[in-house]
Swiss-Prot record:
Subunit structure: Monomer.
One GO CC term, this protein: cytoplasm
Subcellular location: Cytoplasm
Keyword Heme (UniProt): no
PROSITE patterns (alphabetical): TATD_3
Gene behind the chain: tatD
Record-given protein name: 3'-5' ssDNA/RNA exonuclease TatD
Assigned protein family: Belongs to the metallo-dependent hydrolases superfamily. TatD-type hydrolase family. TatD subfamily.
Lyase in keyword set: no
Gene Ontology MF: a single term: single-stranded DNA 3'-5' DNA exonuclease activity
EC code(s) of this entry: 3.1.11.-, 3.1.13.-
Species this protein is from: Pantoea vagans (strain C9-1)
Cofactor: Mg(2+)
Principal subcellular localisation of the protein: cytoplasm
Main EC class the enzyme belongs to: hydrolase
Length: 260
């Protein structure tokens, strides 16, 4: 089973990153994608992935929260990072109109620039969309024929938004949000709509600790070693075998990010 979204650069992991990776391996995780959210963290993510060859890979990008930082220098940094074998996708990029930590215009500019970079480099994109679906689709759609693949990470949208993402050919990343007894109920009902070959799972660790884990972890910090819990729950709600789902999400990740 492959975890496509781990924020291993987070300071929450500063004291025990190696142990976190070991616990993930011991839990049966077969690969992890470390998320880059700005230039510095993308460089850090690449170094962390380089230290775990064959198990960790990384993305290089600028999250919409950091879109105001976008510059030609940052674009050049991402381009250089993309030459590294561990860097397998551009992102995390997209739009976030919930927190609005960067102006909408800055977000759209940085998003479009990263889609252009991914198209130029023939790399898949790791996408973020929160409360911005209409503009997200408007910026993304013209680039789709030129992209080598795309996954919308941490999908928490509506049925209409899911159907639109699937119509655009996107893969869909599901996190432990779906395990939330209150917030995750609508998303839970949408799981059977996602084609088997376009479903990916992720922890988004250290965030989004699954709320239905029993016994509850002593720490509120999420870890990639909890991915098996998400796999088991999603398999139950989709009405399929957890073992088959674990194998399939690994295959899907390796196909999208061209790791096979």
């Amino acid at each position: 089973m492959f975890d496509i979204g781990v924020n291993l650069t987070s300071t929450q992991f500063a004291s025990d990153r190696q142990k976190v990776v070991k616990r993930a391996r011991d839990a049966g995780v077969t690969g992890m994608l470390i998320t880059g959210t700005n230039a510095l963290e993308s460089q850090h993510a690449q170094r962390l992935a380089e230290a775990q060859p064959g198990f960790c890979w990384s993305t290089a990008g600028v999250h919409p929260h950091h879109a105001s930082e976008w510059s030609t220098e940052i674009a050049s940094t991402l381009r250089r990072l993309a030459e590294k074998p561990e860097v397998v996708a551009i992102g995390e990029c997209g739009l976030d109109f919930n927190r609005n930590l960067s102006a909408h215009e800055q977000q759209e500019y940085a998003f479009d620039a990263q889609l252009a970079l991914a198209a130029e480099l023939n790399m898949p994109v790791f996408l973020h969309c929160r409360e911005a679906h209409a503009r997200f689709a408007a910026v993304l759609e013209p680039w789709l024929p030129k992209l080598a693949g795309a996954v919308i990470h941490c999908f928490t949208g509506t049925r209409d938004e899911l159907e639109a993402c699937l119509a655009m050919g996107l893969s869909v990343g599901i996190t432990g949000w779906v395990c939330d007894e209150r917030r995750g109920l609508e998303l839970r009902e949408l799981l059977p709509l996602i084609p088997a070959d376009r479903l990916l799972l992720e922890t988004d660790a250290p965030y989004l600790l699954p709320r239905d884990m029993r016994p509850r972890p002593t720490s509120r910090r999420n870890e990639p070693c909890f991915l098996p819990h998400i796999v088991n729950q999603v398999a139950t709600w989709r009405g399929e075998s957890a073992e088959e789902l674990a194998t399939r999400i690994d295959q899907n990740a390796r196909t999208l990010f061209r790791l096979a």
